Swiss-Prot record:
Keywords: Aminoacyl-tRNA synthetase, ATP-binding, Coiled coil, Cytoplasm, Ligase, Nucleotide-binding, Protein biosynthesis. It catalyses: tRNA(Val) + L-valine + ATP = L-valyl-tRNA(Val) + AMP + diphosphate. Catalyzes the attachment of valine to tRNA(Val). As ValRS can inadvertently accommodate and process structurally similar amino acids such as threonine, to avoid such errors, it has a 'posttransfer' editing activity that hydrolyzes mischarged Thr-tRNA(Val) in a tRNA-dependent manner. Gene3D superfamilies: HUPs, Isoleucyl-tRNA Synthetase, Domain 1, Valyl-tRNA synthetase, C-terminal domain. ATP binds at residue 561. It is found in: Cytoplasm. A motif ('HIGH' region) lies at residues 47-57. Signal peptide: none annotated. A motif ('KMSKS' region) lies at residues 558-562. Monomer. This is Valine--tRNA ligase. GO terms for biological process: valyl-tRNA aminoacylation.
Length: 957
């Protein structure tokens, strides 16, 4: 780092990777270890090893890095823990897909150990690239503590957690309804289910009454259903207890079509009496709502499907407790055997029609559950699974949020959390796949369950001799189970480690709203169950939950691989050609039929690929877009704007260094031997006001606002105004003035670099290494420098008032130049009329600044009422600003020029307006095109109004 030179051209590619290596080599990311200082810890949500990081990861990780760098510069003992997640189903499916594409083999061509070996190889490759991406993003994580959810220590923690929960009777094995993926042959979580709306039908079927004892002309009930194939598993028909149409039928029986099974008519408040006919067929083994009703009424459950989604030859009947029974007649005609759901439906409707049991069919809007992993329709299936009794864990978790021990940001997500926590069902934690934590359970030949650390441990504990054959549970644990232990297991639990004592509870978790229940709530529940404070009370996993919105593409669509609109952060940092971008987006697609659509959209959005922007521009963009839980529409134009912002900071720093390096900056000289100009005092005041607001906004996690205030200060106050205001002194000042301005330039730049470092770490480190040689700072890295603090003693409000007045005067003069089409190179004569003594003094004292910035020839004062010929008059506070019109100015020519320009703009407005008034265009054009046309119309209308105003001003001259 000794060769730091601020080159003329800002090229992020040349500086970012060397700087990161410098940070790593210096071990600056690790906790400093001084436990007398306050600790601060963030546990990064571990990315899945299913591929690479996308913009959503970059967004959340940038927010985390801003916080950790900020707290590190505050002197806190900081730990940012990183790691990766094994992502059970998703990873196994991905590797199976890759194997099939490369060899034509499926999982069934491998032993379990062989497939697992392939997945570990993929894990190594994927984790390596994810680590590379994190480093390119500038993440200041403690790499020495990088974890994986299936490493040895984490696996031990998972086993320990399972055993402890089982021994407290909080884990059990039972037969319940789950989301079943017939292709993957496993249960999946609700998060892995996508509900899609589609057009379908609703069938109205006659259910004949059996020996009706009621007085009625009807011999049947009409039942409406969208899934007639599940009629084979009906065990009741339910009506609402207050539905007067069916009140007398409650307690009677009907004969189920096809099976001729005698089933009861029951009443239940869950029935919607206004939906269909008000009669609901109950199939507890294949519908979640029916399952709840069935449990409530003690109904038997009939499983009609095999695990691959085909009709069974012999249906399985279970009592309401999930035990096999033969209490119902369950033989069905052979014509239905081994049919899949669609064909079974067609066959059953055909049979009902032949038996004159089909009343009618109506079109109906349906919501069909699909597997996010395979795209197949999810089948509610009755299977043996492992469960956690979560209701026994919820109260502490609810109280922690209710009492604001844990705070949600934004607050509205607190209500979402409560709505889930108050309606919990037992959590299915087993999966029928090979990749994951093996459930530490064994069975003997009598299906007795033994839970322990290993078979040897179980035999010793239960005094089992070698004649007792034990079989290991084949299922693995749900990925969310191990993830829910993340905050404490990654710090060494179940051992009582120093890291656990120092850094737990952690300070903040940053996550998306879609996993508040699947991850956040479960982390809170399990952490508060396992981890206790010194006084024995339950310990929380984190103090704050910061919820981010989703990053959507510029059309507002969710970014996903299937849509082909995911953007790799590295492609934004380094750039990518259109050819390579297309290859990346269409490689290893699970749905290759979408490739043409993806190619067309990509070429339309990025015809020339993506230009390199560097990490700092990406980070600043992400922070600027971080607006309190709202979804983010990615904007390449804003990215380009913030790349320009970094470039402006770079060149402003070069300007400062050119005028301060090897110059007398008065760094070690008494303040009395320096003369600070009005501009110096003003910029110091504005800087400290910015620092004050920065701290306040970061405390409430308004990242978008801290980006905005930094952009405003650096671009407009520091670069546009202060650097210009210093030039008269830098070029014509005396020794004291020069010393004061140079001192302000270099010390303010150094402070400004520290203020912006958490957001744009690379460019600030690069410049700071050069700046520190001027300021005499002996520090090794800006990362460990103190973060700027607000200092009220340097606030000079008079300087703010004076400079704001000067700025307004300059802007008024510049506006006049535009209105009169006078080149900036032509010096102007200006006159102030009716000026107070205070303002006159302000102008006189700062006439050099005014003349320099506004390009003035002279400034004069005249009294109220004095006529000043051939001038343009503009009000400026309580006085009047008169600008002498140059002899070269031709009023008529200028009016004609403005009119011609106005006519041209008007034709453009008419063309666009005609297009927007065309219904065919509105109905057929993409929304993005319509939006662009409307924006262009607004722009031209704004220009037109300005031209009209300028023309009016000209006529008055």
């Amino acid at each position: 780092m000794s060769n730091y030179i601020v080159e003329k051209i800002y090229n992020p590619k040349n500086i970012e990777e060397p700087i990161y290596k410098f940070w790593e080599y210096g071990d600056y990311f690790s906790p400093h270890g001084n436990t007398s200082q306050e600790s601060y810890c963030i546990m990064m949500p571990p990315p899945n090893i299913t591929g690479q990081l996308h913009l959503g990861h970059a967004f959340q990780q940038t927010i985390m890095d801003v916080l950790i760098r900020y707290q590190r510069m505050q002197g806190k003992n900081t730990l940012w823990q990183t790691g990766t997640d094994h992502a059970g189903i998703a990873t196994q499916m991905l590797v199976e897909h890759k194997i099939y594409n490369n060899t034509g083999k499926t999982r069934h061509d491998y032993t379990r150990d062989e497939l697992i070996k392939n997945i570990w190889a993929w894990k190594s490759q994927s984790e390596q690239f994810i680590t590379y991406q994190m480093k390119r993003l500038g993440n200041s994580v403690d790499w020495k503590r990088q974890r994986f959810t299936m490493d040895t220590e984490m696996s031990y923690a998972v086993t320990e957690a399972f055993i402890r929960l089982y021994r407290k009777n909080l884990i059990y094995r039972g037969k319940r309804l789950v989301n079943w993926d017939c292709k993957l042959q496993t249960a999946i979580s609700d998060l892995e289910v996508i509900n899609k709306k589609t057009k379908g039908s609703i069938w109205y079927i006659y259910y004949k009454l059996d020996n009706a004892t009621i007085s009625s002309n009807s011999h049947h009930l009409i039942v409406a259903t969208t899934r007639p194939e599940t009629m084979l598993g009906d065990t009741a028909v339910a009506v609402h207890p207050e539905d007067t149409r069916y009140k007398n039928y409650i307690g009677q029986y009907v004969i189920a079509p096809i099976t001729n099974r005698r089933i009861p008519i029951i009443s239940d408040k869950n029935v919607d009496m206004f939906k269909g006919t008000g009669c609901l067929k109950i199939t507890p083994a294949h519908d979640f709502n029916d399952y709840i009703i069935g449990k409530r009424h003690g109904l038997p459950m009939i499983n009609i499907f095999s695990l691959n989604g085909k009709i069974l030859k012999k249906l399985e009947v279970f009592n309401s407790s999930g035990q096999l029974t033969d209490q119902l007649y369950c033989k069905i005609p052979q014509i239905f055997h081994n049919l899949d759901s669609d064909n079974a439906r067609k066959k059953i409707i055909s049979e009902c029609n032949a038996l004159k049991l089909l009343h009618n069919i109506e079109p109906h809007d349906l919501t069909i559950p699909y597997s996010d992993r395979t795209g197949t329709i999810i089948e509610p299936m009755l299977t043996d699974q492992w469960y956690i009794r979560v209701k026994h864990l919820t109260q502490h978790a609810i109280d922690a949020v209710n009492l604001n021990i844990i705070n949600f940001v934004p607050k509205q997500y607190k209500n979402m959390y409560f709505s889930w926590m108050n309606n919990l069902q037992d959590w299915c934690i087993s999966r029928q796949i090979w990749w994951g934590h093996k459930i530490p359970a064994w069975y003997d030949d009598n299906n007795t369950i033994y839970v322990g650390y290993c078979e040897k441990d179980i035999r010793i504990k239960n005094k089992l001799n070698n004649n007792v054959i034990l079989h290991r549970e084949k299922d693995v644990l749900d990925t969310w189970f191990s993830s829910s232990l993340w905050t404490f297991a990654a710090l060494g639990w179940p051992k009582n480690t120093n890291l656990l004592n120092v850094f737990h509870p952690t300070n903040i978790i940053i996550s998306g709203f879609d996993i508040i229940f699947f991850w956040i709530a479960r982390m809170i529940m399990l952490t508060m169950h396992f981890i206790k404070n010194d006084n024995g009370s339950a310990q929380i996993p984190f103090k704050t939950v910061y919820i981010t919105g989703l990053i959507r593409d510029e059309l507002g669509q969710k970014m996903s691989k299937s849509k082909g609109n995911i953007i790799d952060p590295i492609d934004i940092i380094d750039g990518i050609s259109i050819e390579n971008l297309l290859k990346k987006r269409t490689k290893n697609m699970l749905q290759p039929q979408l490739s043409k659509h993806i190619i067309n959209n990509t070429i339309k959005q990025f015809p020339n690929g993506i230009k390199p922007h560097g990490t700092d521009a990406l980070r600043f963009t992400l922070v600027a877009l971080a607006s309190s839980g709202r979804d983010i529409h990615w904007d390449m134009q804003r990215l380009t704007g913030y790349r320009n912002f970094c470039n402006k900071l770079w060149h402003a720093s070069r300007f400062v260094l050119m005028h301060t390096k090897n110059q007398d900056c008065g760094i070690s000289i008494n303040i009395n031997e320096k003369s600070f100009s009005l501009a110096d005092r003003w910029i110091i005041t504005k800087f400290h006001q910015t620092v004050q607001i920065f701290h306040k906004k970061l405390e409430i996690y308004r990242f978008d606002e801290i980006a905005n205030i930094l952009h405003e200060f650096i671009w407009h106050q520091f670069c546009d105004w202060y650097l210009e205001l210093t030039k008269p002194i830098l070029y014509h000042g005396n020794a004291l003035e020069l010393r004061g301005t140079r001192y302000t330039l270099i010390t303010l730049l150094e402070s400004l670099l520290r203020l912006t470092h958490p957001i744009i770490p690379f460019i600030t480190e690069k410049i700071w290494q050069e700046v520190k040689t001027v300021t005499g700072n002996n520090g090794t890295t800006i990362m460990l420098q103190p973060f700027p603090k607000y200092d009220e003693s340097v606030i000079d409000m008079k300087s703010v008032i004076d400079i704001e007045w000067i700025k307004n005067a300059v802007l008024a003069i510049r506006t006049a130049r535009v209105n009169m089409n006078i080149s900036y190179n032509i010096p102007l004569q200006i006159v102030f009329r009716d000026t107070s003594s205070e303002v006159k003094k302000r102008i006189t004292e700062n006439s050099k600044i005014l003349c320099h910035i506004a390009q003035l020839k002279s400034i004069h004062f005249i009294s109220k009422g004095t006529i000043y010929p051939k001038s343009m008059t503009m009000p400026l506070d309580s006085s009047e600003l008169l600008i002498r019109i140059p002899d070269t100015f031709n009023k008529e020519n200028e009016i004609n020029r403005l009119k011609k320009e106005s006519e041209l703009i008007n034709r453009k407005i008419e063309t666009i307006q005609k297009l927007l008034d065309d219904n065919n265009f509105i109905n057929q054009a993409p929304k993005s095109v319509i939006k662009d046309k409307q924006a262009l119309l607004n722009y031209y209308e704004l220009i037109q109004n300005k031209l009209i105003d300028q023309c009016a001003i000209m006529k008055k001259l």
